[in-house]
Amino acid sequence: MTLFQLLREHWVHILVPAGFVFGCYLDRKDDEKLTAFRNKSMLFQRELRPNEEVTWK
C-alpha cells in the first residue's frame, strides 16, 4: 500500500482530529485576548466584595 493510497482512504481520520486540535488552539488564543480585554475593561475594574466570586469564568 503506497502513501498516496493510505492518504486517499484515511484522509478523514487525519483531518478531523487535526481540525479539532487547531480549533482548540484558536479557542485558547481567543480566550487570552478576551481575558486581556477584561482586565482593562471599566466594567470589571471594581474591587470585589468579600466572598464575592468573579463573574467571568
UniProtKB/Swiss-Prot annotation:
Belongs to the complex I NDUFB1 subunit family. Disulfide bonds: none annotated. Coiled coil: none annotated. The keyword ATP-binding does not apply. Keywords: Electron transport, Membrane, Mitochondrion, Mitochondrion inner membrane, Respiratory chain, Transmembrane, Transmembrane helix, Transport. The chain crosses the membrane at residues 10-26. InterPro entries: NDUB1 (IPR012575). It comes from the Eukaryota. Accessory subunit of the mitochondrial membrane respiratory chain NADH dehydrogenase (Complex I) that is believed not to be involved in catalysis. Complex I functions in the transfer of electrons from NADH to the respiratory chain. The immediate electron acceptor for the enzyme is believed to be ubiquinone. This is NADH dehydrogenase [ubiquinone] 1 beta subcomplex subunit 1. The gene is Ndufb1. Complex I is composed of 45 different subunits.
